[in-house]
Each structure stands twice: as structure tokens, then as C-alpha cells.
Regions:
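Conserved alpha-helix/loop element of class I SAM-dependent methyltransferases that forms part
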Residues: 1-18
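Class I SAM-dependent methyltransferase SAM/SAH-binding core
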Residues: 21, 27-80
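A short SAM/SAH-binding and catalytic strip from SAM-dependent methyltransferases
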Residues: 89-103
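Short conserved AdoMet
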Residues: 15, 39, 102, 116
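A short acidic, Gly/Pro-enriched loop at the edge of an enzyme's catalytic core
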Residues: 77-91
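A short glycine-rich, Lys/Arg-flanked "PGG" loop and its adjoining helix->strand segment in the class I
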Residues: 35-36, 105-120
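Short glycine-centered segments of the SAM/dcSAM-binding site in methyltransferase folds
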Residues: 19, 43, 118-120
Length: 120
């Protein structure tokens, strides 16, 4: 059973202006929940490896009117696969995706690379 994005996001203590990477964003439930918490000065990077899901997510983001969400086609299991700069994220979300990863350590390494020191 998948977890509830809204309830999980509350536990992260997201604040206005934070930068969040959503690994394996899928249809954007976590990205949408984060968007309202980080506000217009924050940014959510919704990263998905499946091109068809990226297109669907881009459509949803537009439909929802979210201006602070960027949809990225990327490989979360490969170094620099997310196309995000080193130590630039306050939070990296890895929900409902780790069990599917073929290279779990690669995924963790990519999250660690983009996470700021002291990030979550």
C-alpha cells in the first residue's frame, strides 16, 4: 500500500523558499503537495525516468497552475542523472520508488550528491 503524500510532507517541515527533489515523481502527488509548502520562492523538481509519465506530469502541473514545479526526465539511479546541481536541494523525496530501483546504491548516491549539507 502506498503512503499518503500530504501526511508525509507535513513531517518534513518544508518551509517557504526550500528546494525539493521528488525522485520517481510519477503522476506528481508528492510534487503537488510540496509545491504549496515551498511557495512561489521555492522550487520542486519532479524527476521521472518514464517519458510518458513526464509528459502526463507536465500536463498535470499546468492544469494545477503550479509555477514552481519543474518536470525533469532523468535517471535517479545514475550519477548526475537528475541533471540537478551538487548540494542544491534542501530535501530529497524517495517514496514508493526505492523498492523498484535496480541500483539502490546508485539512487542513494545521487540523492546524497544533490542534497545540501544538513538536508533531509
Amino acid at each position: 500500500m502506498f503512503t499518503n503524500p500530504e501526511q508525509n510532507i507535513l513531517r518534513l517541515g518544508l518551509k517557504e523558499g526550500m528546494r525539493v527533489a521528488d525522485f520517481g515523481a510519477g503522476t506528481g502527488f508528492y510534487s503537488k503537495a510540496c509545491s504549496s509548502r515551498v511557495g512561489p520562492t521555492g522550487k520542486v523538481y519532479a524527476i521521472e525516468v518514464q517519458k510518458d509519465l513526464v509528459k502526463k506530469l507536465e500536463s498535470e502541473v499546468k492544469h494545477w497552475g503550479l509555477t514552481n514545479v519543474d518536470c525533469i526526465w532523468g535517471d535517479i539511479e545514475r550519477r548526475n542523472g537528475t541533471k540537478i546541481s551538487d548540494q542544491s536541494m534542501n530535501v530529497v523525496i524517495i517514496s514508493n520508488v526505492l523498492f523498484q530501483a535496480e541500483d539502490k546504491l546508485g539512487l542513494i548516491d545521487e540523492a546524497k550528491r544533490i542534497l545540501k549539507k544538513g538536508g533531509e
